Amino acid sequence: MQRTIKSFFQPKLGAEVKTKEEKVKNDVQKEKEEPEKSVPERPLKERNGRALCGDTESPVKRVSKKSARVLESDSEEEEENSKVQATPEKMNNESDPKNDVKETPPSARKETPPSARKETPPSARKETPQSARKETPPSARKDAKSEGASEMNTSQDFVSPCSSKSIDSPLCSDSPGISPSGIPKRKTARKQLPKRKLEISPSESNPPKDDFDVKGAVKRQKKEAEGDIQQEEPMETSHNISMEEECPIKKETNPDVVQETISNADDPNIELVDQKDVVSGEKQSEPKCQEQPQPKLTSPTVEPKASKGKARKKNSPLPKKVKFSDKVSFKDNDSEEKSNEEKSDEEPQKKADSAKPVKQISSFFAPRKPAIKTEKREENLNEKNVTETSLEESPKPKKNVGSFFGASKQEATEEQTEYNPSKSKYHPIDDACWCNGQKVPYLAVARTFERIEEESARLKNVETLSNFLRSVIALTPEDLLPCIYLCLNRLGPAYEGLELGIGETILMKAVAQATGRQLEKIKAEAQEKGDLGLVAESSRSNQRTMFTPPKLMASGVFGKLKDIARMTGNASMNKKIDIIKGLFVACRHSEARYIARSLGGKLRIGLAEQSVLSSIAQAVCLTPPGRDAPPTVMDAGKGMSADARKSWIEEKAMILKQTFCELPNYDAIIPILLEHGIDDLPKHCRLTPGIPLKPMLAHPTKGIGEVLKRFDEAAFTCEYKYDGERAQIHILENGEVHVYSRNQENNTTKYPDIISRIPKIKKESVKSCILDTEAVAGDAEKKQIQPFQVLTTRKRKDVDASEIKVQVCVYAFDMLYLNGESLVKEPFAKRRQLLRDSFLETEGQFMFATYMDKSNTDEISEFLDQSIKDSCEGLMVKTLEQDATYEIAKRSHNWLKLKKDYLEGVGDTLDLVVIGAYLGKGKRTGIYGGFLLASYDEESEEYQTICKIGTGFTDDDLEKHYNFLKDHVIENPRSYYRWDSATEPDHWFDPVQVWEVKCADLSISPVHKAALGLVEDQKGISLRFPRFLRIRDDKKPEESTNSFQVADLYRKQQQIQNTSSTEKAEEDFY
């Protein structure tokens, strides 16, 4: 039994006593032969854990593991015995099997005399507490060298954490003693002392050793008796040692990690390489040990301490492999040479080693990396590099752990946060914050909006947006269309009628629910900042969440906005709020600001549609799309001069703008642009009936003299400017008829009466066409035009022809398309003639605009007066031949308008009192952006609201008004104010100031209360298009325009005079 235990702790000892030289030779041979034999005999199942100690093939029985534990515990107890007679039981709990194997060479163990081993009785060892070993000072370690016997006894007791009772057997103290080769053993054990302390867990240190360790010892003894020593010799390889080091941890860690480590250990390739390294290391280290013994000792001593705990974190056996191979080779040389100089060299190194381990304790809890990955990294390093690498790599496991909880996401987030499309020399791929094929993050869109909002220069904003779009084209071309719609704050073509329909109150409620704030605070902050978007951003940034929601993507946000717009029904509002809440919760940084603004209907970043078109053109020019992903050309304008580059881009932008004018549908243009490029757009995108155009608009003039000066000698014509609603009538080849407004809204269901007339008034030659007309309210029997206010009383959607009360007459004045041919490039004279040749005029239903082709000033003046008498707004003056094309979506100087409110002597100004104001938004944030005006009623002695006003002010005017009126704010309106809840202002004022205001005309209003009941029962009068002129400091509020004056001004309007006679006749026959 004694012999079996000795051999168990000394795997290289044979059954017979041999000489020193023979033992060394046998050890070398075993190291070379055993790996091949042992690999196939070690099934993965047996090597997984120590519970299989009973099997003869179990890795727990392997001498490598046993010897490693014996040697490491041996060195630990050396320190303990030098300070106190250590208790082997507690020492066993803290010992590391790995370190023992590395530090004890076979030769050293064989030379140790049994007497030396028996010097320290087991009882003395049992009395040593755990703390004694941890507190062992460097001096104690030095003295411990002389106590080789006691140290060897304790080391042998630590066969493994599985066999603690073997400590009590005196026969187990046959481990190497005071021989020269024993010194390095003790030194190496001290080096790795901190590591052993870290690896021992409380669960292993006490109760389990009494039961489980004894069984392991007995089983190993049986194995020794059966002659399994040779199979255990490969334990000297670094790989086997790493396996032993993992033993005490395997019980505490995840089984998956344990299995991964064991599977790596079973790899025969890895084991063979390790053994070769060990043998070669022994041969090469021999001359080095003779010439430079101290450096050879230094590297192994420093390394274990530097990597203490760190190698364990990584779960990597390689650092230990390098250490072990070096140490074993060095010890073998020691045993042959018996050098006393090396003993003295080890002492100062032990001192240095003892001071290092404390720093590494804190890293015990860091997770471990896979073993093989680290092994490959460090396999080619020398000893010193291994030491440095182990120190440098210690924080890396922490990095991996952090990334497990989202560190890598955080890095990506930081990259997106720093995205700057306005930087100079922007690269579409390198400077983008997403990768090829990935969805465009909405944060990139928000960052682009931020840069545009901060910059006032239009050209710079065009460049910024084009840079962003270049990245989209290069990396994610399928997201180009959603990104463009987000920049325009639209959900699709205007004629599709997709509107969000989210009011400010609903938005505030959604923000409050999403951020957990009180609705009252949201409202108060919104009034203070003047921008609900900023409130949403600040509210979201102050909110903390337990789990980070998925990041918003541009296409995803666009899809959610479309879903909101399509929802209808009684429960739709709650569903919309839920979607909005989901968007706000996932917002980062400025995303909430622009989502709130998008939902509110205005981005307020100063980005007009023409700027967006210019940006698209510039992006496509510089980074032309293609089938390659990403495109091969990143900057097509590289090498051009600044002027050439500018003119080239402007030329391409004009192609896009003209194409968009004829086909204002991004859904149709963008796919063709990506597939065929910008040069081929006109071939594929043409004017198409069913897709509304943006109409041509006219410039206002101050008088007839300006008209004559503008057109000079060019022929022009004058037409009535009808006071109605612009109507673009599309007749399709299949016979369908659509009516669109000037804003491209589909009004087909609003005018079923017009639809029914078209087949009757068009000639058979007309297969398809597009007409530009004005829908005007009129009385066909009286042949009179009614004011625009009458037209507004019609139902806006889904009108039933049988329920129509306000009849409409269509006044056609232009034709843009006829039978498959676009006429926009034709002169106006030709278009007008084609119009008259293609349709039949019907009184009160379909009429051609009244015109006069004369250029005499007097005749024009008379014609203007006649237009006003005929209840029109004034005249439209147009060129006939020269520069007479139809300029889609342009306010052209080739069309001029003469309106009555622009001429002197027509209309009158009103003096009105300011009684309320609305807080400004956007550029007017911090001051008042609009005001509520009222007239004074002398009979009732009250102020009656007449209009809201927000135009005609300069920035100085607004500042002046704010500074004056803020001192006259009252909490509630005066009892003598007559107003409607629909016009309630943010601040009420005392009536202290009178303003002079001009307007286009006056109209009947159900909301405003001026002249209430004087013109129409239960209705008042309001101003259309009021403009601020000046402050009337010479008038008191009571001297302002009164209700009777307002009613009189309304009656004096020419078109009202025309309708008043009709109304009297109707009243007469009523």
Swiss-Prot record:
It comes from Xenopus laevis. The keyword Transmembrane helix does not apply. Residues 184-195 have a biased composition (Basic residues). Its cofactor is Mg(2+). PANTHER family: DNA LIGASE 1, DNA LIGASE 1/3 FAMILY MEMBER. The gene is lig1. Belongs to the ATP-dependent DNA ligase family. Keywords: ATP-binding, Cell cycle, Cell division, DNA damage, DNA recombination, DNA repair, DNA replication, Ligase, Magnesium, Metal-binding, Nucleotide-binding, Nucleus. This is DNA ligase 1. Residues 15-49, 91-148, 207-216, 273-289, 323-356, 372-386 have a biased composition (Basic and acidic residues). GO terms for cellular component: mitochondrion; nucleus. DNA ligase that seals nicks in double-stranded during DNA repair. Also involved in DNA replication and DNA recombination. GO terms for molecular function: ATP binding; DNA binding; DNA ligase (ATP) activity; metal ion binding. Its EC number is 6.5.1.1.
